[in-house]
Design a protein with these regions (language model features):
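Membrane-active amphipathic alpha-helices enriched in small hydrophobic residues
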Residues: 448-459, 468-496
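Conserved ATP-driven motor cores of ASCE-family P-loop NTPases powering translocation/secretion/packaging/pilus
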Residues: 43-45, 68-88, 286-372
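Conserved P-loop NTPase motor module
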Residues: 5, 108-114, 125, 320, ...
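Conserved lysine of the Walker
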Residues: 37
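Pre-Walker A (Motif I) flank of P-loop NTPase domains
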Residues: 14, 22-27, 53, 218-222
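The conserved Walker
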Residues: 29, 33, 276, 305
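N-terminal pre-Walker A segment at the start of P-loop NTPase domains
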Residues: 1-15
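P-loop NTPase motor domains
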Residues: 45-55, 62-286, 312, 356-357, ...
Length: 501
């Protein structure tokens, strides 16, 4: 199987390639803003797609969408391709599927609250340890009572139930404070305003739909529209982490293949690790270490190589380092880290060259036969065949119209789950509370004959019309009954739905 051509070595005048059989050994693409990282990602995605490997990546700036349409074939690109040795270079599109958590620029991406789980949901909600513990109790309570947590309404309903039965739940599951519940409810409200209502629900994303191969044998490139999503860093990074965890948990062990089953590109990777607790970082490290045996290659993209923790950085065998500008002590440290992580090349002063690289140039080291990293090469990156810029709305609509997943995800499904079941139980409670009062009124009316009727006739007269005194008496009775009924409804439904009317 032909390797993926990344570019041409300037240092040793050789073709710099990535071996497909080692594509699952993960990778890193790093460099300052404007140095060509996005073009490198597009070249990687195209290369894997041509080999029949599906790719999933986020489009943070909008220009990755250009993968879906052919390039312009500009003279400078043709010249660069000839210099690098790209055979038969011609503009070409890649098979793509657009996804969007908000459902505007692609197929909606959804998962259920249960599938996300309390740990990752707590990260999205930015809860502290105490509040995270209460969220664990909410999930445990849902399991014990057979209540499905599918969407935000279900989560709000369970939080209301916990608030209503707080004392009993605290005795059985552990202390639950009203303050913690209120804090979680406020966080849920913020998440809903940030688009959580669209993300949580059904139909949930099926992994098979991001691992498709088209009829020509090319891997489909799944592009997640993230230009708005990245403005919510916790939601963006946690969604990608959830997706990576789902791949790890659901895919079977396959060992080393001749090419990966999927390549997962994580742009703006620093967002994944910012403020992440040690336990979560340890989990990510475990997933990255083990997921390669399931045929998945993970490629992180960020400005600085040390944005990725050292234990994870050490597992990234294929590296492309674009220019770093050493203006600050932070930048100087990053340059030193980058230089130390490459296999030395006696012809190259890595620390010096890093700050002198031009746009479209990079220091590259990939794994060769037997998994041995090649000495670092200053490399001229090969141009992609697609458009190096965003597509138009009309072009996007055309791609979506031909999507192989059709309209499967375009319409949300709201099946019976926790919110509906708790509402039904609340309604039954209200009906049971009102039933005795109704029976009492029937008995009173039955007793209006005989002695009771004689008394009534003596006081109010025999005509079947309400006098002022009777009218006032009945209005008073109805008012008291209505207020009591409303209080019961508010007490039950208000607790379940967090005060929502």
């Amino acid at each position: 199987m032909d390797p993926i051509l990344l570019g041409k070595g300037i240092t040793d005048d050789i073709a710099v390639t990535l071996l497909p059989k080692l594509g699952n050994r993960h990778g890193l693409v790093a460099g300052a803003t404007g140095t060509g990282k996005t073009v490198t990602l597009m070249t990687l995605a195209e290369g894997f797609s041509r080999l029949g490997v599906p790719v999933f990546l986020a489009d943070v700036k909008g220009d990755v969408s250009g993968l879906a349409v052919p390039g312009t074939g500009a003279e400078n690109l043709l010249k660069r391709a000839a210099e690098i040795g790209v055979a038969d270079y011609a503009p070409a599109a890649s098979p793509t599927i657009f996804w969007d958590l908000y459902g505007k620029l692609g197929h909606p991406v959804r998962t259920t609250v249960s599938e996300m789980g309390p740990t990752l949901l707590a990260r999205i909600l930015e809860l502290n340890d105490t509040q995270s513990g209460v969220l664990d109790i909410v999930f445990k309570l849902a399991d014990d009572r057979g209540l499905l947590l599918l969407d935000m309404d279900d989560l709000r309903a369970l939080l209301g139930l916990v608030a209503e039965e707080r004392k009993d739940i605290s005795t059985e599951y552990g202390l639950v404070s009203a303050q913690s519940i209120a804090a979680i409810q406020r966080s849920v409200l913020r998440l809903a305003q940030d688009g959580g209502e669209n993300f949580f629900g059904e139909p949930a994303l099926e992994l098979a739909d991001i691992m498709r191969v088209n009829h020509d044998g090319r891997g489909m490139i799944g592009i997640l529209a993230a230009d708005q999503l990245v403005l919510k860093p916790k939601l963006y990074s946690t969604f990608l982490l959830w997706l990576l965890s789902e791949l790890f948990e659901q895919l079977p062990e396959v060992g080393d293949l001749d090419k990966p089953k999927l390549v997962f590109i994580f742009d703006e990777a620093h967002l994944l690790f910012d403020d992440a607790p040690p336990s979560l970082v340890q989990r990510i490290e475990q997933v990255v270490r083990l997921i390669r045996s399931k045929g998945v290659g993970v490629y992180f993209c960020s400005q600085f190589p040390d944005d990725v923790p050292g234990n994870i950085l050490g597992q990234l065998g294929n590296r492309v380092q674009h220019a770093l500008r050493a203006f600050t002590p932070r930048d100087q440290k990053a340059v030193k880290t980058a230089a130390e992580t490459f296999v030395p090349n006696p012809k190259l002063d890595v620390a010096k060259v890093l700050s002198q690289l031009g746009t479209g140039e990079a220091l590259v080291s990939t794994l060769q036969d037997k998994g041995v990293p090649m000495p670092v090469q200053q490399t001229m990156i090969a141009p992609p065949h697609c458009r190096m810029g965003p597509i138009t709305d009309a072009e996007r609509a055309q791609v979506r119209a031909g999507s192989p997943v059709g309209s499967r995800y375009d319409t949300a499904i709201n099946r019976e789950s926790a919110a509906e079941l708790l509402a039904q139980r609340a309604q039954k409670t209200v009906e049971q509370a009102q039933a005795p009062a109704a029976r009492s009124r029937e008995q009173d009316e039955a007793q209006e004959g005989g002695f009771g009727q004689a008394i009534k006739d003596a006081i109010f007269g025999t005509k079947r019309r309400q006098g002022m005194i009777e009218t006032m008496a009945k209005q008073t009775t109805r008012t008291v009954g209505t207020k009591l009924g409303n209080q019961i409804v508010r007490g039950i439904l208000g607790g379940i739905f967090g005060g929502k009317r």
